[in-house]
């Protein structure tokens, strides 16, 4: 079995999907988790205005609506939280995403003060916090806020990790990579677009250029620029298609480099890193 085949099998990616079937699978998955854990009454998710959080947010809202209808328990709810660092340049996109999601509760927690305070506290030791490192502090500050809200609302935190992001490990460890449940896992980027289209989303919500937008020295840098490979190439690879030698090498290099992000903290019994 080639490495490409191993990765596809591990991430569970299908070459062709039925969007309606995958929507139902994710909604049922989210409902099943709530049913298994009756002390949980909500889902919490940070909404950036990008494709992934827009899709995960709408799926979560559908899940809690069905839970209310099926159980008669109106305490189930979805909490969408905006987590800007100061003023977000594409705030209009985030508001359009919220309008599409129609969350039960929409909140805003501005992370600038907390992220800046942590950066300042660390630099007070004499350490230098790079722009890239501060970007990770921002991502982790956002997850702190989401878990604080989940604690207040008897909730679980939804993550937006999907196959195209997972294969490249394009997420912050214990930041956006830290969550309780991943309803998009198994889908690549173009398949996520198909689900949003099937849900009736405005194409503007999933056709915008994806960006993590964490670095102040490189504001709005596109994911594809940071990765050195396009999402179309990543998606083709994950669907078992042939890609250029350069694209394959880049994708597989990210896969190897990011292995530590896909595991809990390493123990003496772990072998993957040796």
Curated annotation (Swiss-Prot):
It comes from the Bacteria. GO terms for cellular component: cytoplasm. Deamido-NAD(+) binds at residues 140, 173, 180, 260-261. GO terms for molecular function: ATP binding; glutaminase activity; metal ion binding; NAD+ synthase (glutamine-hydrolyzing) activity; NAD+ synthase activity. Keywords: ATP-binding, Ligase, Magnesium, Metal-binding, NAD, Nucleotide-binding. Gene3D superfamilies: HUPs. Its EC number is 6.3.1.5. ATP binds at residues 46-53, 160, 189, 211. GO terms for biological process: NAD biosynthetic process. Mg(2+) binds at residues 52, 165. Pfam families: NAD_synthase. It is an enzyme of class 6 (ligase). InterPro entries: NAD/GMP_synthase, NAD_synthase, NH(3)-dep_NAD(+)_synth, Rossmann-like_a/b/a_fold. Pathway: Cofactor biosynthesis; NAD(+) biosynthesis; NAD(+) from deamido-NAD(+) (ammonia route): step 1/1. It catalyses: deamido-NAD(+) + NH4(+) + ATP = AMP + diphosphate + NAD(+) + H(+). Belongs to the NAD synthetase family. HAMAP family: NadE_ammonia_dep (MF_00193). Catalyzes the ATP-dependent amidation of deamido-NAD to form NAD. Uses ammonia as a nitrogen source. Homodimer. This is NH(3)-dependent NAD(+) synthetase. It comes from Streptococcus sanguinis (strain SK36).
